Design a protein with these regions (language model features):
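Long, contiguous internal "core" modules enriched in hydrophobic/ aromatic residues
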Residues: 1-310
């Protein structure tokens, strides 16, 4: 049964009936109008409600929910800026190493024989080749593609990759042969190409979360990064054989960024991240540091991540 339409005033009354205090009606109404009930309330209320009764905990306010939403918006902006840097780097690296191995003819990146014969490659290759064929021969939404078709009857990969998403680049990396993967991994100082592929897969997923405005701080991926030296150096607790955090959560993306960004880039990113977390905790005490870090998958010593050499 569809839910009935509620005016902003009715939405506020609904929140009050659930036990949520609204200290400033004008500010609440403004947020509901500017952002919407679903993104703010449905997205963040679970951290202030009793899960068994669905009633807000005593003392919870709309301002608490809005503050958490605004923290997450800032976190997404910080993460997305760093993720875009990696996206540019991996796009450039994939195009360069593939062209160095096979040349600049589009016929090469459209040829399945130029890719690995592994299970992972075979899984992604059919859709990858269809997507690359569309970019090379049919896409009319990018003028630079049309120009290369007209002028050269060929769209080299270093042009085509600019029309690919981070997720598509991730799939192409998966499909490459071991020699190309190893050279790309070496660029980033990552010894194991499989580790690089895992980092990129996770970062591509988090890039989508950020770009689509989904709740980030408590997000969990369906794929994980491998165990790294940083997990051990940061003293992350283990539950059985598995690390309790830094595998599928936001901190897994932070670890991947630590490996893939330059030192100066990561230090600048970390400084913004520290300011964001500290700023939220100092301005709103409704969740508390321990609960916030647990939701984000951040270990207690997360700020020491730049102390250790990779």
């Amino acid at each position: 049964m569809p839910k009935e339409f509620l005016t902003y005033q009715q939405q506020m009354e609904k929140l009050r009936r659930s036990g949520l205090a609204i200290e400033d009606e004008e500010a609440c109404c403004g947020a509901l109008a500017d952002i919407g009930y679903f993104p703010v309330v449905n997205g963040y209320q679970s951290f202030f409600r009793d899960p068994s009764t669905r009633v807000y905990r005593e003392g919870a306010t709309f301002g608490d929910i809005l503050a958490l939403y605004e923290f997450d918006v800032e976190l997404r902006e910080i993460m997305l800026d760093a993720l875009l840097k990696v996206e540019v780097k991996i796009r450039s690296a994939v195009a360069y190493e593939f062209c160095a191995a096979y040349g600049e003819s589009q016929s090469k990146y459209l040829d399945a024989r130029c890719y690995a014969a592994s299970k992972g490659s075979k899984r992604v290759l059919p859709k990858l080749l269809n997507m690359l064929d569309y970019i090379a021969n049919k896409d009319t939404s990018h003028e630079y593609l049309a120009y290369y078709r007209r002028a050269y009857k060929n769209v080299p990969l270093w042009v085509a990759v600019n029309a690919m998403t981070f997720g598509q680049i991730s799939k192409m990396l998966t499909a490459l042969r071991d020699n190309e993967k190893a050279r790309i991994a070496k660029r980033f100082g990552v010894g194991n190409p499989k580790e690089l592929s895992s980092f990129i897969r996770v970062l591509a997923l988090y890039r989508n979360v950020c770009a689509h405005g989904e709740r980030l701080f408590s997000h969990r991926c369906h794929v994980e990064i491998p165990d790294t030296a940083l997990h051990a150096k940061l003293g992350i607790e283990k539950i059985g054989p598995d690390y309790a955090c830094g595998k599928v959560d936001v901190f897994s993306a932070v670890i991947a960024l630590r490996y893939l960004l330059r030192d100066d880039e990561f230090k600048a990113f970390k400084a913004k991240l520290v300011r964001c977390v500290n700023g939220y905790l100092s301005s709103d005490e409704s969740i508390g540091e321990e609960r916030l870090l647990e939701a984000m998958g951040f270990p207690a010593e997360w700020k020491k991540i730049t102390r250790y050499k990779l």
